[in-house]
UniProtKB/Swiss-Prot annotation:
The gene is NOX5. One of its GO terms (biological process) is regulation of fusion of sperm to egg plasma membrane. The lineage of its organism: Eukaryota, Metazoa, Chordata, Craniata, Vertebrata. Residues 441-577 form the FAD-binding FR-type domain. Keywords: Angiogenesis, Calcium, Cell membrane, Electron transport, Endoplasmic reticulum, FAD, Flavoprotein, Ion channel, Ion transport, Membrane, Metal-binding, NADP, Oxidoreductase, Repeat, Transmembrane, Transmembrane helix, Transport. The chain crosses the membrane at residues 239-259, 267-289, 318-338, 363-383, 395-417, 435-455, 584-604. It is an enzyme of class 1 (oxidoreductase). This is NADPH oxidase 5. Ca(2+) 4 binds at residues 178, 180, 182, 189.
Length: 765
């Protein structure tokens, strides 16, 4: 081993072939910089510093890695030791990485290596795991060692399994790797086992140690995707509406300004902005006519108008209103300054700006004071509508300040002589819809029949379904529970299928004040009320333990109750288009599964309706599709951070898999894809053994050890390029992607959809 620290010459095979000289030098500079940051003043890395830098959850791996990096057994790692070890581990050959992995798994090797320190692996000998004979330790991995490693892998990936399942995983991997059946896994046997997984050996790394690899150089700036042909094609309806909106503003501004050109530039600007505000402040209500928009979704206009972006257009128009109001105010202020400075002016500046004495305006000269009040109200609504307030547990602040739109409209009627004409039709529609919604919701006083408290603070409500409440898969409703907050209505996606006649399901994630109070109230022994009679009539509370087919035993709380609530809806969403698609890709992140749960259940009910059994011979068959469903294929992708979140809908997914198994002869209509982001993948040395064992046991038992489903849960995040390539290669018809989840992931998916020519629809709240 070369002790000069030149990584180009280290290792039995060298690693210059994997790195250019420039990359080599840049990587060494990066490692040196990170080493100095971690090591501190003493210039060496201790075990505790190594653990903190590695960001591993399980100290087992940190201790194993540290022992193998510390070639001189000094109890600390020097810069030279770190460089030599990482050169082989990060940029070395597959055999170098495999030797390291074997030493990690051969637990008793370190004790024996420590006894021989100073002989074979003396100081300056380089990484002992790369140059020493494998037989220095025990030279093999026994079942107890493998079980210890797999147990640490489980903790590292935040997976909890019972001891019996851990024993089964250990046995499955050990029996597969121990080719000669002598009760121990040798280096050659581990190598042969890994070679069954293509690409794993070449890509083995320690993913959690982000400080091991230098940041990639910035890529060359590419053309913004907004300027690509695919973007313009996929967003043509939105772009057309934006162009029409901008053109209308130019027209309104120009007409109003030209009509007052004799009064000066400031008045022209003020009048132009005022005319645009007449339109914006009235039409902004049209974008929130949920019943009208739901009705339009069922017409041909849904193919022309961007109905799914109504909330984004509402927000955009809100920004425009605030901007125009500021310009309008500044222009009038400049005009008042000029008037007050005129010799013949009987009014001072503050009188023109704040009083009714000048007689400016339609009603008792109130234009100036109402204008100031309007600007303050609009700024308040604008600030309280920001995402940092709405999504940080202060939704009530947004809700109550947004109700001041009623006062804004009233002040606008007093402020401008023509605003009432602009508001007449939109205002009638808006208040008519509000009146209908209020009447229907009060007539539809229903009750919460059952509550299930699920993992990750999710509340599952079962509400008695009114006989006239008709909805489609993926629709949402507004819920009001007077015992939580008398005047607050919150939107939630319906997670039950329309074919479910008796109840409506809602799955509510605790993320704000209202949802947290809902969960905590039912979690308490006296739900919703500290003994108040009108809050709850809980009949029974029972706790049941159930095993998720190999997953950990969960403790769920079920409460049967009779709590009065009100519902308003249903309202349509983009997911209504799913059954008109040919190949639908449903992507849910976390609780974003709720609209797709309704859709998947509806699919299950429709398939059950098509299934028939002969009463004589018990032969079963499935008729062709008799409804309007055009679907040829459905890919459902569910991404969760932790294991317990899969429990929300595991029973539904199990039933879907059973139905698919019965229809296997007709082709696989529905494919499930499950991803757990906290789990490490096969390319990570801290998880390769576990993932291999999970694969082997899943093939043996025909079910996943994490969820109990037949579908194998994949670790990490999806590789969207590979996922969409597979979807495109199936050629099942035009692909439409439906997503419900975080805006950050939506942006990523939107870019991939534009690349592959898929239509993208997002659930908005």
């Amino acid at each position: 081993m070369n002790t000069s620290g030149d990584p180009a010459q280290t290792g039995p095979e060298g690693c210059r072939g994997t790195m250019s000289a420039e990359e080599d030098a840049r990587w060494l500079r990066w490692v040196t910089q990170q080493f100095k940051t971690i090591a501190g003043e003493d210039g060496e890395i201790s075990l505790q510093e190594f653990k903190a830098a590695l960001h591993v959850k399980e100290s087992f791996f940190a201790e194993r890695f540290f022992a193998l990096f510390d070639s001189d057994r000094s109890g600390t790692i020097t810069l030279q030791e770190l460089q030599e070890a990482l050169t082989l581990l990060i940029h070395g050959s597959p055999m170098d990485k495999l030797k390291f992995l074997f030493q990690v798994y051969d637990i008793d090797v370190c004790a024996r290596q420590g006894a021989s320190a100073g002989t074979e692996w003396g100081a300056g000998a380089g990484p002992h795991w790369a140059s020493s004979p494998l037989g220095t330790g025990s030279g093999s991995i026994d079942p107890d060692e493998l079980r210890t490693v797999l147990q640490s892998c489980l903790r590292e990936s935040a997976i909890s399994l019972p001891d019996e399942k851990l024993d089964q995983l250990t046995l499955a991997l050990f029996e597969s790797a121990d080719a000669d059946g002598n009760g121990a896994i040798t280096f050659e046997e581990l190598r042969d086992e890994l070679q069954r997984f293509p690409g794993v050996m070449e890509n083995l790394t320690i993913s959690a140690a982000h400080w091991l690899t230098a940041p990639a150089p910035r890529p060359r700036p590419r053309r913004p995707r907004q300027l690509t042909r695919a973007y313009w094609h996929n967003h043509r309806s939105q772009l057309f509406c934006l162009a029409t909106y901008a053109g209308l503003h130019v027209l309104l501004f120009g007409l109003a300004a030209s009509a007052h050109r004799d009064l000066g530039a400031s008045v022209m600007v003020a009048k132009g902005c005022g005319q645009c505000l007449n339109f914006d402040c009235s039409f902004i209500a049209v974008l929130m006519l949920r019943r009208c928009l739901t009705w339009l979704r069922a017409t041909w206009l849904a193919q022309v108008l961007p109905l799914d972006q109504n909330i984004q257009f509402h927000q955009l128009m809100g920004y425009v209103v605030v901007g125009l109001s500021l310009v309008h105010t500044v222009a009038h202020t400049v005009n008042f300054v000029l008037q007050a400075q005129a010799e013949a002016s009987p009014f001072q500046f503050w009188e023109l700006l704040l009083t009714t004495r000048p007689g400016i305006g339609w009603v008792h000269g109130s234009a100036s004071p109402t204008g100031v009040a309007l600007l303050l109200l609009l700024l308040l609504m604008f600030i309280c509508s920001s995402s940092c307030i709405r999504r940080s547990g202060h939704f009530e602040v947004f809700y109550w300040t947004h109700l001041s739109y009623l006062l804004v409209w009233l002040l606008l009627i007093f402020h401008g002589p023509n605003f009432w004409k602009w508001l007449l039709v939109p205002g009638i529609l808006f208040f008519l819809e509000k009146a209908i919604g209020l009447a229907v919701s009060r007539m539809a006083a229903v009750c919460i029949m059952e509550v299930n408290l699920l993992p990750s603070k999710v509340t599952h409500l079962l509400i008695k379904r009114p006989p006239f409440f008709h909805y489609r898969p993926g629709d949402y409703l507004y819920l009001n529970i007077p015992t939580i907050a008398r005047y607050e209505w919150h939107p939630f996606t319906i997670s039950s299928a329309p074919e479910q006649k008796d109840t409506i399901w809602l799955h509510i994630r605790s993320q704000g004040q209202w949802t947290n109070r809902l969960y905590e109230s039912f979690k308490a022994s006296d739900p919703l009320g500290r003994g108040s009679k009108r809050l709850s009539r809980s009949v029974t509370m029972r706790k049941s333990q159930r095993s998720s087919k190999g997953s950990e035993i969960l403790l769920e709380k079920h409460k049967f109750c009779n709590i009065k609530c009100y519902i308003d809806g249903p309202y349509g969403t983009p997911t209504r288009r799913i059954f008109a698609s040919e190949h639908a890709v449903l992507i849910g992140a976390g609780i974003g599964i709720t609209p797709f749960a309704s859709i998947l259940q509806s699919i299950m009910y429709r398939h059950q309706k098509r299934k028939h059994t002969c009463p004589s011979c018990q032969h079963s068959w499935i008729e062709g599709v008799q409804d309007n469903m055009k679907l040829h294929k459905v890919d459902f992708i569910w991404i969760n951070r932790d294991q317990r979140s899969f429990e929300w809908f595991v029973s539904l997914l199990t039933k879907l898999e059973m139905d698919q198994a019965e229809e296997a002869q007709y082709g696989r209509f529905l494919e499930l894809h499950m991803y757990m982001t906290s789990a490490l993948g096969k390319n990570d040395m801290k998880a390769i053994g576990l993932q291999m064992a999970l694969d082997l046991l899943a093939n043996k038992e025909k079910k996943d050890s994490i969820t109990g489903l037949q579908t194998r849960t994949q670790p990490g995040r999806p590789d969207w390029s590979k996922v969409f390539q597979k979807v495109a290669a199936e050629k099942k018809g035009k692909v439409q992607v439906f997503f419900c989840g975080s805006p950050a992931l939506a942006k990523v998916l939107k870019g991939h959809c534009e690349k592959f020519g898929f239509r993208f629809f997002q659930e908005n709240f």
